[in-house]
A protein has these predicted regions:
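Structural motif
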Residues: 126-128
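Hydrophobic membrane-insertion alpha-helices, especially the h-region
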Residues: 2-18
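Cleft-lining beta-strand/loop regions that shape enzyme active-site pockets
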Residues: 21-34, 38, 42, 46, ...
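Extended, small/polar residue-biased N-terminal targeting/export presequences
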Residues: 49-110, 156-188, 508-518, 525-533
Length: 535
C-alpha cells in the first residue's frame, strides 16, 4: 500500500468516495481534517530513519489501534483477510468444494459439497490429499491457511490433486475445475413434528432472504402450521437481510428497525404488508451468541408482539458499520450509526472506548455471575421500554427473551470439559468415521444412524482412545457425563457422514429450548398477550 494510502486512512486525507455496503445507500467521503502531524511523522520516518522501514507494516499496526479507540466494532480488515470476509457474507466463493481437516500433517477430506466440482471429479469423503498441482503437500507445510490458498482460486481455473483413498496405497490423480461454492446461511429446514417447522439461520448474508423463502416453501409442502426460527449463535451480518426476513412475518407499516447517527439522519425500515406469513405462530430462539442482525430480527418480532422469544439474553450489538474498501484490497468497517428496535431501545451493551478486554469477556462474566442458569441474575443496564401492547422490555444490553431457558449443565464434569476442549472428541469422531465409512455410508437417515451408534457404545470406544492419547480414564466421571459425551461424539460422526441438516436435527433432539417452543405452540401462546393492569 503506497504511503499516501496509509495517510488517507490514518488522518483522513481526501482520496475519493467510497460506497457503503448494504447497511446504507449513502456515500461516505473521507475528507482532509487539516491535521498533518501523522502524515509528517510517516514522511520523516520514511526519509530519515536510520534503517529502512516498511511503512505499510507501520500503517497495518496503527490503523487497528486508532479504530480500537472508537468502539469495539470499528475494525480494519487487511487485504489478505478481506476476500474471506466478503465470501462469508456474499454466500459463495470459488473453490473445489470440500470440507477438510488436517490430521498427522495431511489433509483429510471430511465432506464433499453435493454436486460441487470435487464431487463431479470423483473426490470422496475420507480421501487424503497428498499433492497439489504435482507438488507434494504433506508435512509441516500443511496448514489451514496454506491449504485454503492452494485449493481456492478463480472460477474455471484448474487444480490437480493427488489423493490416497482409504484402504489403498496408490495415489490417484484428479483434475478439478474450480467453481462457485455456496456458503448457505440457512443450514437446516425440517419439521419438528407434524405441525411445526424449524429453520436454522447461521448468519445474515446476501442470500439469506431467498434461502428463507425456499425453506418456507419446502415446509409449506409439509403443511406446517407454526414455525421455530433458530438464531442461536448467529453473529449477524447484513441488516437488510434481517429486515427482509422480518417483513415476511409483519403486517403492513410496522416499524422493523431504525438507524440514526451523528452524520446519518434517522432512517426507518417498515414492513410493506406483502409478507406471506403474517399470522403464522412464531417462536424465535436466541442466546448469548446471537448478535447484530439476529437482534434486529428478534427485536422486531418482540417489540411488535408478533411472536415469542425463547432462550437466553443475546449479545448486545447495537452499532451499525459501513464498509469502506481501499485500492489495495484492504477495508475498514466504521461505526456510523446506532440501530433502535421499534420500541426505541438501543440494545448495545456498555463499552469503554479503547478497552476491548472487558467487552470481549462480557459473556464469561455473565456465565460467572450465574446469568446462564437463572433469569434472576440478568442485570438490565438500560432503561425500560414498552412493546405495542404494553409489555416491558429493556435496552442497553441485548434482547432479553420472553421465556428464559437456562443452560443445561446436567452431567458436566471436568473429564467432559477436557475431552471437549482438547479436540480429542473431534479427532476420535473422524478416526471412527474413517475406519467405519463403508458401513456408516449405508444409513440413509439420521435416526437410523444415531440408533446404530448408540448400539456401538461410542463413549466406551472414545474413553479407550482418549486414554491412549493423554486423557486419563475417569470411570465415575465418564458415567456421569455419558449422555453429554454420547451426544457430542455421535453428532460429529453424523456430521462427517451426512450434512448440516442431519447434524442439526440430531443435536436438537431433547433440546430444552426446542421443547419449550413446542410447549408454547401446544398451549397456543405464541402470540404474546397484553399484560394485566394492576389496580
Amino acid at each position: 500500500m503506497p504511503l499516501i494510502m496509509a495517510l488517507c486512512v490514518i488522518v483522513g486525507i481526501l482520496i475519493g468516495t467510497f460506497y457503503a455496503n448494504h447497511f446504507s445507500g449513502n456515500r461516505l467521503n473521507i475528507i482532509n481534517s487539516g491535521s498533518n502531524r501523522l502524515s509528517n511523522l510517516l514522511h520523516i520516518i520514511n526519509d530519515q530513519y536510520v534503517d529502512k522501514v516498511d511503512i505499510d507494516s507501520l500503517v497495518d499496526v496503527a490503523i487497528p489501534q486508532i479504530l480500537a479507540d472508537l468502539d469495539p466494532h470499528s475494525v480494519y480488515i487487511s487485504a489478505k483477510d478481506a476476500q474471506a470476509v466478503a465470501d462469508d457474507l456474499k454466500g459463495s466463493f470459488s473453490g473445489v468444494g470440500i470440507e477438510f481437516t488436517i490430521r498427522q500433517d495431511t489433509i483429510r477430506v471430511q465432506n464433499v459439497v453435493k454436486n460441487g466440482p470435487a464431487q463431479r471429479a470423483g473426490i470422496l469423503a475420507g480421501d487424503k490429499i497428498v499433492s497439489v498441482d504435482g507438488k507434494p503437500f504433506v508435512g509441516k507445510i500443511v496448514t489451514n491457511e496454506e491449504a485454503m490458498r492452494r485449493l481456492k482460486g478463480p472460477k474455471d481455473t484448474k487444480v490437480k490433486l493427488g489423493v490416497v483413498r482409504y484402504g489403498q496405497k496408490k495415489v490417484k490423480y484428479f483434475t478439478i475445475t474450480r467453481g462457485d461454492i455456496p456458503q448457505k446461511s440457512i443450514t437446516a429446514a425440517y419439521m419438528l413434528d407434524k405441525n411445526t417447522g424449524y429453520i436454522k439461520v447461521r448468519s445474515f448474508g446476501e442470500t439469506t432472504y431467498p434461502e428463507m423463502l425456499i425453506a418456507l416453501a419446502q415446509l409449506s409442502q409439509e403443511n406446517f402450521k407454526s414455525l421455530v426460527i433458530d438464531l442461536r449463535d448467529n453473529t449477524g451480518g447484513y441488516m437488510n437481510s434481517a429486515v427482509q426476513m422480518a417483513n415476511e412475518f409483519l403486517p403492513k407499516n410496522k416499524l422493523i428497525v431504525y438507524m440514526e447517527g451523528r452524520k446519518s439522519p434517522r432512517q426507518d425500515f417498515r414492513s410493506d404488508g406483502h409478507g406471506s406469513y403474517q399470522k403464522l405462530p412464531l417462536c424465535v430462539l436466541i442466546n448469548e451468541g446471537s448478535a447484530s442482525a439476529s437482534e434486529i430480527f428478534a427485536g422486531a418480532i418482540q417489540d411488535n408482539d408478533r411472536g415469542t422469544i425463547i432462550g437466553r439474553r443475546s449479545f448486545g450489538k447495537g452499532l451499525v458499520q459501513q464498509q469502506l474498501g481501499f485500492p489495495d484490497g484492504s477495508m475498514i468497517r466504521l461505526t456510523i450509526a446506532r440501530y433502535y428496535t421499534p420500541s426505541g431501545r438501543c440494545i448495545q451493551k456498555p463499552f469503554t472506548a479503547g478497552d476491548t478486554k472487558d467487552y470481549e469477556s462480557d459473556i464469561v462474566t455473565r456465565y460467572e455471575h450465574g446469568e446462564f442458569f437463572s433469569q434472576d441474575s440478568i442485570k438490565h443496564q438500560g432503561p425500560a421500554y414498552h412493546t405495542g401492547i404494553g409489555r416491558t422490555v429493556y435496552g442497553g444490553g441485548g434482547i432479553t427473551p420472553d421465556i428464559f431457558v437456562p443452560e443445561d449443565t446436567l452431567g458436566m464434569t471436568s473429564y467432559y470439559k477436557q475431552a471437549a476442549m482438547s479436540g480429542l472428541i473431534l479427532q476420535f469422531a473422524f478416526t471412527y468415521t474413517d475406519n467405519n465409512r463403508p458401513k456408516l455410508n449405508t444409513f440413509v437417515n439420521m435416526m437410523s444412524l444415531s440408533k446404530y451408534l448408540v448400539q456401538q457404545n461410542t463413549v466406551e470406544q472414545f474413553a479407550t482412545y482418549a486414554d491412549k492419547n493423554g486423557l486419563k480414564r475417569r470411570n465415575l466421571m465418564i458415567r456421569k457425563s455419558h449422555k453429554l459425551l454420547e451426544k457430542f461424539i455421535n453428532s460429529r460422526i453424523i456430521y462427517n457422514i451426512m450434512d448440516d441438516q442431519a447434524w442439526t436435527a440430531y443435536i436438537n433432539l431433547d433440546d430444552p429450548t426446542i421443547e419449550k417452543a413446542l410447549e408454547v405452540f401446544k398451549k397456543n401462546e405464541a402470540f404474546p398477550k397484553k399484560p394485566s393492569i394492576k389496580k
